[in-house]
Curated annotation (Swiss-Prot):
Residue stretches of biased makeup (Acidic residues): 230-240
Taxonomic classification: Eukaryota, Metazoa, Chordata, Craniata, Vertebrata
Organism of origin: Rattus norvegicus (Rat)
Name the record gives this protein: Malectin
Signal peptide: 1-30
Record region (Disordered): 220-264
Gene that produces this protein: Mlec
Length: 291
């Protein structure tokens, strides 16, 4: 049994250690406690299928391994016309994912086997590297017969030689595929189709499917021009009769999830050391009282 002074010294030392732990920056505290902190951790393992359309195999900055296009020599045509251009919104290391593409004069697509049920996200990567105005290339994207992207005009969305991601969440449960409010029978495979429209040919630069939600998907770098356009669309208007404010909301597919609130994670990480402090301090105090 510890002597009173020794027990008191041990308790003081423990409290100092816990106080120091509370004062550490969140990233260091989480690392020391073994708490998963970095966003995107485990992302490569959650990706079940990824293809660099029209290009060679590539591992991106997040560790996702994009395989060489399996449609090479079978369907459509590969193009590396975009290799002449820098791609905005993309990191230099991953511009290759937007500089090559596969297109076809008719509807074409990819077939992806999915063995397990759960929540998934389809991420489609595009960049317009040829046309310099809108209404030149417009097409739809279908997933197992569901139109998940309607009238996609890449130039109209983000401009020329600029990366654009379409992010489509879905769930597979009890033999059913649920996507964008629609449900269909699922037979073990996802069919991703790029549908020929009235304006030029459908295409895709890269694509992948991952287990998870849209919050798990890495987002592209900010696009100042696009942000300004969205702000203008959301400006407040006034009704002439009542002067009531209303907000105009365009039903647009965003090119990535919202930035997570950093303070939300900070609060959760603070709770762990506080609980540890109480859990250790109370038994120590009890031992001191018995002395």
């Amino acid at each position: 049994m510890l002597k009173p002074r020794a027990a008191e010294g041990a308790a003081v030392a423990l409290l100092r250690l816990l106080l120091l732990l509370l004062l550490l920056p969140p990233e260091l505290r989480d690392r020391g406690l073994g708490v998963a902190g970095a966003a995107g951790a485990g992302l490569p393992e959650s990706v079940i299928w990824a293809v660099n359309a029209g290009g060679e195999a590539h591992v991106d900055v997040h560790g996702i391994h994009f395989r060489k296009d399996p449609l090479e020599g079978r369907v459509g045509r590969a193009s590396d016309y975009g290799m002449k251009l820098p791609i905005l919104r993309s990191t230099p290391e991953d511009q290759i994912l937007y500089q090559t593409e596969r297109y076809n004069e008719e509807t074409f697509g990819y077939e992806v086997p999915v063995k397990e049920e759960g929540d998934y996200v389809l991420v489609l990567k595009f960049a317009e590297v040829y046309f310099a105005q809108s209404q030149q290339k417009v097409f739809d994207v279908r997933l197992n017969g569901h139109v998940v992207v309607k009238d996609l005009d890449i130039f109209d969305r983000v401009g020329h030689s600029t990366a654009h991601d379409e992010i489509i969440p879905m769930s597979i449960r009890k033999g059913k595929l649920s996507v964008q409010g629609e449900v269909s029978t699922f037979t073990g495979k996802l069919y991703i189709e790029f549908v020929k429209g009235y304006y030029d040919n459908p295409k895709v630069c890269a694509l992948y499917i991952m287990a998870g939600t849209v919050d798990d998907v890495p987002k592209l770098q900010p696009h100042p021009g696009l942000e300004k356009k969205e702000e203008e669309e959301e400006e407040e208007e006034y009704d002439e009769g009542s002067n009531l404010k209303r907000q105009t909301n365009k039903n647009r597919v965003q090119s990535g999830p919202r930035t997570p609130n950093p303070y939300a994670s900070d609060n959760s990480s603070l709770m762990f050391p506080i609980l540890v402090a109480f859990g250790v301090f109370i038994p120590t105090l009890f031992c001191l009282c018995r002395l």
